[in-house]
Amino acid sequence: MDWLQLFFLHPLSFYQGAAFPFALLFNYLCILDTFSTRARYLFLLAGGGVLAFAAMGPYSLLIFIPALCAVALVSFLSPQEVHRLTFFFQMGWQTLCHLGLHYTEYYLGEPPPVRFYITLSSLMLLTQRVTSLSLDICEGKVEAPRRGIRSKSSFSEHLWDALPHFSYLLFFPALLGGSLCSFRRFQACVQRSSSLYPSISFRALTWRGLQILGLECLKVALRSAVSAGAGLDDCQRLECIYLMWSTAWLFKLTYYSHWILDDSLLHAAGFGAEAGQGPGEEGYVPDVDIWTLETTHRISLFARQWNRSTALWLRRLVFRKSRRWPLLQTFAFSAWWHGLHPGQVFGFLCWSVMVKADYLIHTFANVCIRSWPLRLLYRALTWAHTQLIIAYIMLAVEGRSLSSLCQLCCSYNSLFPVMYGLLLFLLAERKDKRN
């Protein structure tokens, strides 16, 4: 087994690993009394700029330009209008970049550069931070930089005043991945006194490293099993189900490994869960809880726990503000945020229907199923069904293209979401009659 190829096969893993020593250095410098708060902001910002240029090359401009514009917007707009205008600018910019990917993939039929994929991934994370910051300002939780037009301060003072916001948008531990950190938590971590700054827990980092090693070994074993089988276009019945489940497991193992690596980088820099939570600070939200994701029999719980910080961001940004069809609007926006590929649109809309069905099915079961043997059987069956439906959705989203989506829809695997869809129709009709 080529271990070097195993751990650095994905470019994001390579660049996240390359940033690790600098995260440890930042943590060490913060313990020193001579490392001022302004120096911390500059270190994080400079590290983000260097990492962006190293990972994205000339495409890094697609990150720097919206970050600069976002800081300008939050500096000069009033709190009442800052979120709306910032949101539409950021999503418009991201959509244009995704349309460039569509043009290259579907019209030209050429594979886009790897650096462009990394840029789009980082741009999606930047959108999270920009909209989170603008929401905080709009809700009065965070103060915007002083208004340049109304203030008589010099231009350099305005730049220093905007430094925390600019550093937040581009700080290197979260540039390429990681749980969404609010501006308030980011500011509290950076401004924490040297005596209160958390020391590096090498035991926690070692444990995360062992988890990544185990996940990567599982990926190698599963990849060999998947590659030896048939494809979705020529599989038959149970073989199609096994192929879908094992391929989805490959995707999940990749996500788990990346999320743990991202969490390790944030921890090494002092922004992880081990940093604790002081008065007025927001808690750290990890993206992955493997045990909950793999043992739950509820599709709705899986949706809330999968990429948890993003799920909370979508809930705050879309779900709570939607007056009609909040669930559908949330998943539709998620498809827009991911790039509006055919498989993504179908996958996320299917997911919203499955979550709605999940609520009705489990509400009905809690009333009708009383004995514990039947409850145990029900839980086992719904767990298996949940895992297979999630695998179906994952293949649709990750396949992206229309041809891959057609292969998936024409396979026997479509039986599982169709079954939940029929139950949704029957239970919704029963609920309407009772009302």
UniProtKB/Swiss-Prot annotation:
Effect of N366H: Does not affect protein cleavage
Disruption phenotype: Mice display a complete lack of octanoylated ghrelin in blood.
Regulation: Inhibited by 1-[2-cyano-3,12-dioxooleana-1,9(11)- dien-28-oyl]ethylamide (CDDO-EA) with an IC(50) of 60 uM. Inhibited by Fe3+ and Cu2+ and the O-acyltransferase activity is completely blocked over 5 mM Fe3+ and 0.5 mM Cu2+.
Post-translational modifications reported in the UniProt record: Not glycosylated.
Record membrane topology: Multi-pass membrane protein
pH dependence text: Optimum pH is 7.0-7.5.
Consequence the record notes for mutating N307H: Does not affect protein cleavage
Signal sequence region: none
The protein, known as: Membrane-bound ghrelin O-acyltransferase MBOAT4
Organism per entry: Mus musculus (Mouse)
